[in-house]
Amino acid sequence: MDPLGPAKPQWLWRRCLAGLLFQLLVAVCFFSYLRVSRDDATGSPRPGLMAVEPVTGAPNGSRCQDSMATPAHPTLLILLWTWPFNTPVALPRCSEMVPGAADCNITADSNVYPQADAVIVHHWDIMYNPSANLPPPTRPQGQRWIWFSMESPSNCRHLEALDGYFNLTMSYRSDSDIFTPYGWLQPWSGQPVHPPLNLSAKTELVAWAVSNWGPNSARVRYYQSLQAHLKVDVYGRSHKPLPQGTMMETLSRYKFYLAFENSLHPDYITEKLWRNALEAWAVPVVLGPSRSNYERFLPPDAFIHVDDFQSPKDLARYLQELDKDHARYLSYFRWRETLRPRSFSWALDFCKACWKLQQESRYQTVRSIAAWFT
């Protein structure tokens, strides 16, 4: 007579099953949360985030905190083993170079070597006798050595003597650990920083400033063929004087500048383009790496490459055509509507090393500078 009697055990069984399923769901959520938290703490950074870790094993507590530092950005002590080319340079705070950036204590006082978190070694200043000019071989625990050069492989001697000494590379090469190009283009918008190009002030055609002549070099041989068809004003040693104080004023009178590199290597695009040509508002005529290499750093219509012409005579004819066609000549300046050139400074390069060291604590050894750089 009791219709509910047989249904009671079934109701209890369903209730137990629901409880077990709920506990299982809670467990799955908990372990999923635990794994995500663990991955965020020790794994690769998620897209859009930067993993910032303190340098482990830094010597003698040199990561002291100051008013600009935070736990994520320790204030490191960086030693310049020599001034670049033995010439002292100003060392402003890195936060002054890039507002809001972290700071390091950067010094050329070799007495701080035992406390330094990192040592920057400028290759040119040690290359003639590396064994005698390098820092002491017994380095403090965790100290990182940075190999630094803005010269091309053709002008870097005794690279093989540096095997196993360094932890990071720093150069104009884009595949360096710390990339320090001679120049770059910075996007901008709004009113032009410079007044529009005054074409009437461009009273001369082609200039070239060269300090190391090298009669057998590719650039001198090309110039000698070019000047047979086109007048080129040459400045520098054994040529017209070009005082540093009036250099930009002089070069800005020219429509074109021969930005010919002293040696041909990937990414080796120097101040000859970034300062001598672009800062003078002259169209650079380049001889260096390939056009495609230049186009990694410049719009294709910002320069003229010698490889675009079958001969120096053809290049001369093209420059003479542009001299008479103002519209075509001015087309080489359109990129300046949205971009502006910037040139390197030693201080900014040292700050780039500071920021790299703060962001990456990984300790590595560069087995062979020579194998990588040449």
Swiss-Prot record:
Enzyme class: transferase
Pathway(s) per entry: Protein modification; protein glycosylation
Cellular component annotations (GO), alphabetically ordered: Golgi cisterna membrane
Intracellular or extracellular location(s): Golgi apparatus, Golgi stack membrane
Highest taxon in the source lineage: Eukaryota
GO biological process, one term: fucosylation
EC number of the protein: 2.4.1.152, 2.4.1.65
Cysteines joined through disulfide linkages: none
Database matches in InterPro entries: Glyco_tran_10_C, Glyco_tran_10_N, Glyco_trans_10, GT10-like_C_sf
Any one Gene Ontology molecular-function term assigned to this protein's record: alpha-(1->3)-fucosyltransferase activity
Lumenal side: 35-374
Tagged with keyword Transmembrane: yes
Glycosylation sites noted in the Swiss-Prot or TrEMBL record: 60, 105, 167, 198
Mode of membrane association: Single-pass type II membrane protein
Reactions it catalyzes: a beta-D-galactosyl-(1->3)-N-acetyl-beta-D-glucosaminyl derivative + GDP-beta-L-fucose = a beta-D-galactosyl-(1->3)-[alpha-L-fucosyl-(1->4)]-N-acetyl-beta-D-glucosaminyl derivative + GDP + H(+); an N-acetyl-alpha-neuraminyl-(2->3)-beta-D-galactosyl-(1->4)-N-acetyl-beta-D-glucosaminyl derivative + GDP-beta-L-fucose = an alpha-Neu5Ac-(2->3)-beta-D-Gal-(1->4)-[alpha-L-Fuc-(1->3)]-beta-D-GlcNAc derivative + GDP + H(+); an alpha-Neu5Ac-(2->3)-beta-D-Gal-(1->4)-beta-D-GlcNAc-(1->3)-beta-D-Gal-(1->4)-[alpha-L-Fuc-(1->3)]-beta-D-GlcNAc derivative + GDP-beta-L-fucose = an alpha-Neu5Ac-(2->3)-beta-D-Gal-(1->4)-[alpha-L-Fuc-(1->3)]-beta-D-GlcNAc-(1->3)-beta-D-Gal-(1->4)-[alpha-L-Fuc-(1->3)]-beta-D-GlcNAc derivative + GDP + H(+); a beta-D-galactosyl-(1->4)-N-acetyl-beta-D-glucosaminyl derivative + GDP-beta-L-fucose = a beta-D-galactosyl-(1->4)-[alpha-L-fucosyl-(1->3)]-N-acetyl-beta-D-glucosaminyl derivative + GDP + H(+)
Transmembrane segments: 16-34
Chain ranges on the Cytoplasmic side, renumbered to this chain: 1-15
Role noted for this protein: Catalyzes preferentially the transfer of L-fucose, from a guanosine diphosphate-beta-L-fucose, to the N-acetyl-beta-D-glucosamine (GlcNAc) of an N-acetyllactosamine unit (type 2 chain) of an oligosaccharide, or a glycoprotein- and a glycolipid-linked N-acetyllactosamine unit via an alpha (1,3) linkage and participates in the surface expression of VIM-2, Lewis X/SSEA-1 and sialyl Lewis X antigens. Preferentially transfers fucose to the GlcNAc of an internal N-acetyllactosamine unit of a poly-N-acetyllactosamine chain acceptor substrate.
Family (UniProt): Belongs to the glycosyltransferase 10 family.
PANTHER family: 4-GALACTOSYL-N-ACETYLGLUCOSAMINIDE 3-ALPHA-L-FUCOSYLTRANSFERASE FUT5, ALPHA- 1,3 -FUCOSYLTRANSFERASE
Name of the protein this chain belongs to: 4-galactosyl-N-acetylglucosaminide 3-alpha-L-fucosyltransferase FUT5
Species per Swiss-Prot/TrEMBL record: Pan troglodytes (Chimpanzee)
